[in-house]
Swiss-Prot record:
CDD domains: OAT_like. HAMAP family: ArgD_aminotrans_3. May also have succinyldiaminopimelate aminotransferase activity, thus carrying out the corresponding step in lysine biosynthesis. GO terms for biological process: L-arginine biosynthetic process. The keyword Transferase applies. It holds the Pfam family Aminotran_3. The lineage of its organism: Bacteria, Bacillati, Cyanobacteriota, Cyanophyceae, Synechococcales. It is found in: Cytoplasm. Binds 1 pyridoxal phosphate per subunit. SUPFAM superfamilies: PLP-dependent transferases (SSF53383). Pathway: Amino-acid biosynthesis; L-arginine biosynthesis; N(2)-acetyl-L-ornithine from L-glutamate: step 4/4. This is Acetylornithine aminotransferase. Belongs to the class-III pyridoxal-phosphate-dependent aminotransferase family. ArgD subfamily. It comes from Prochlorococcus marinus (strain MIT 9313). The keyword Isomerase does not apply.
Length: 418
């Protein structure tokens, strides 16, 4: 048995081995050929000592950057006290985080879980319970947008309006229908058709800005009317704020960008600053869960909640919301300048705050993943949001000088494709 284990171990890669060496990790990601070992602020280092400017931040997750002093201190203290207990008992760190969230949002109560997909699963269950209890619907329908992304679990991916994510996993969970994002006429026609014979729609689940779907910002006029229609029909309006929430868009919450309030919204990513936590936040009238309706073993554990509360208070203490607005404007201005200087390659810029997308020309012969790959040569980390959008989601602490470096390295990357 020992020889067999040694044989297995020798077949797999290790730190310092070739980045393309086989590993025991399942191949669910098409990984870049880079092994990252440490980080500080907006910078990360690989196993060869190369330094990269990180405009990915764990995909909009490391709000305070890497190895943040306040996070290290608070989490070190928490590990000395209590790391995990069951939700069968009261958890002070969980209650403190919930209090902060409801004091600083439109919500009245919070359910904690471990990820964005889990938060959206909870939202889907909440929507169905609302449909059954409040609207008397036997088979509730949830409306979501084309090009949306709500997670990789089965119900969340069924809610995702991108058929390529469905392939190979059929049958999808029933009860989802899709409409064109920001298209009010199409939405109203679909809603009227579905409601013509009586109540059938329980909720609308929608991103204020579509991240994975191409960095598509919501239009305020569309969302205002969406809010009116949902209220008129007693339909829950649920925002997926997994990527835009916790200050990334230049406000605490994406709904503030649009001037309306949802009945519920979901969070994850930046909430934990790099630690696994998700949340469903609801207004009082949408708080329908009862004991036994939903649960999470690890959701809201003391360690994760301590991390999230530290992130929230550090964003406040450092005035990062205003800085995100300033740095976002600086980044957008620089990206707009690149569009003007690379007209054959680039089409435009879109996004909010420090969630910006550089849109490639439709006829360009290269893709956003090609750009992300080439950026590694310039020691820059960026990611794709679909085939034609290069996405930048740096830590919220990024400095003006680092924005300038990001733009310089991105320009050098684009020169590969002239």
């Amino acid at each position: 048995m020992v020889d067999a284990l040694d044989s297995k171990s020798s077949a797999f890669g290790h730190v310092g081995s070739s980045p393309t060496a086989p590993t025991a990790v399942m191949g669910t990601y098409k990984r870049f050929p880079v092994t990252l070992l440490r980080g500080k602020g907006c910078w990360v280092w690989d196993d060869h000592g190369h330094q990269y400017l990180d405009a990915v931040a764990g995909i909009a997750t490391c709000a305070l950057g890497h190895s943040d002093r306040a996070l290290r201190r608070s989490l070190g203290q928490q590990l000395k006290q209590l790391q995990h207990v069951s939700n069968l008992y009261r958890i002070p760190e969980q209650e403190a985080l919930a209090h902060w969230l409801v004091e600083n949002s439109c919500a009245d109560s919070v359910f904690f879980c471990n990820s964005g997909a889990e938060a959206n699963e909870a939202a889907i269950k909440l929507a169905r319970k609302h449909g059954h209890r409040r609207r008397g619907i036997d088979r509730p329908i949830i409306l979501t947008a084309n090009s949306s992304f709500h997670g990789r679990t089965l119900a969340a991916i069924s809610a995702t309006g991108q058929p390529n994510f469905h392939k190979g996993f059929e049958p999808m969970v029933e009860g989802f229908e899709f409409f064109p994002f920001n298209n009010l006429q199409a939405f109203e026609q679909q809603l009227n058709r579905l409601e013509a014979q009586g109540p059938s729609v329980a909720a609308v689940l929608i991103e204020p800005l579509q991240g994975e779907g191409g960095v598509n910002p919501g239009e305020a006029g569309f969302f205002r009317r969406l809010r009116e229609l949902c209220s008129q029909h007693q339909i829950l309006l649920i925002f997926d704020e997994v990527q835009v929430g916790m200050g990334r868009c230049g406000n605490w919450w994406g709904y503030q960008q649009l001037g309306i309030e949802p009945d519920a919204f979901t969070l994850a990513k930046g909430l934990g600053g790099g630690h696994a936590i998700g949340a469903l936040l609801v207004k009082q009238h949408a708080d329908l869960f009862e004991p036994g309706d939903h649960a999470s073993t690890f959701g809201g554990n003391p360690f994760a909640c301590k991390a999230a509360l530290t992130v929230a208070k550090e964003i406040e203490r450092r005035g990062l919301i205003a800085k995100v607005q300033q740095r976002g404007a600086q980044l957008r201005e620089g990206l707009t300048d690149l569009v003007q200087r690379f007209p054959r390659q680039l089409k435009g810029v879109r996004g909010w705050g420090l969630l910006q997308g550089l849109v490639l020309q439709d006829e360009s012969t290269f893709t956003a993943p090609n750009v992300a790959q080439a950026a590694l040569e310039e020691k820059l980390l960026v990611i794709a949001a679909g085939p034609k959008v290069v996405r930048m989601v740096p830590p919220l602490i990024i400095k003006p000088s680092e924005i300038r470096q990001l733009l310089q390295r991105l320009e050098a990357t684009l020169a590969h494709f002239r």
